[in-house]
Amino acid sequence: MAKLYDRKNALVAADMLNYKVVPWFEEEGIRLLMILTDRGTEYCGNREHHEFQLFLALEDIDHSKTKARHPQSNGICEQFHRTIQDEFYAIAFRKKVYNSIEDLQKDLDQWIDSYNNERTHQGKYCFCKTPIQTFLDTKELAKNKYLDNLQFS
C-alpha cells in the first residue's frame, strides 16, 4: 500500500496509518502491534504535541526506531524504496506527464498491486512467493502473536 502526499510531516504520517495501514490490518483480522520507522521528524517528537506519536498512543501501537544514520537497520524498507524508484517512478515519469497527484496515485496503485500480487520475490522471507502469499501463509502466526500478547498483559 502506498499513498502520495504533497508534503512530509507528522500529520501526513498519522494519516497514512489511520486511512490505509490500520484499516488494512483490521480487514485481515490482525491488530497492528508495532511499527518500525526511521528517526525522521515526521515520526519522532513529543507524544503530547506530535500527531504521529499521539496517533500511536491512541491506537496503542508500539514504536521502534532504526539506529540513527544507519539505514541498514531497516534493509527491507530501503530495498523497497530503491525498487519503487527504479521500477516505477523512473519509468512512469519518462512515459507520461502527470497533471495531478491523483493520476500518479492511480498508476502507483496498479504497480503496487502487481508488486504484491503477481511478482514473486527472492529472499529469506518470501521464498519465491508473492508478498501477499507470504502474508497469507503467515497470517495465523500474526494472530497468535496478538493472542500471546493479550495473555501476558
Enumerate the predicted regions with their spans.
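Short small-residue beta-strand/loop micro-motif enriched in glycine and branched aliphatics
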Residues: 1-3, 64-66, 90-92
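Active-site beta-loop-alpha junctions of metal-dependent nucleic acid enzymes
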Residues: 2-28
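Residues immediately flanking
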Residues: 7, 39, 117
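Acidic/histidine-rich, metal-coordinating catalytic segments
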Residues: 17, 26-46, 128-130
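Surface-exposed charge patches
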Residues: 23, 54, 58, 113
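Hydrophobic beta-strand scaffold residues
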Residues: 32, 62-63
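RNase H-like two-metal-ion nuclease catalytic core shared by retroviral integrases
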Residues: 37-39, 43, 49-56, 63-87, ...
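C-terminal domain-tail junction helix/linker
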Residues: 59-61, 83-153
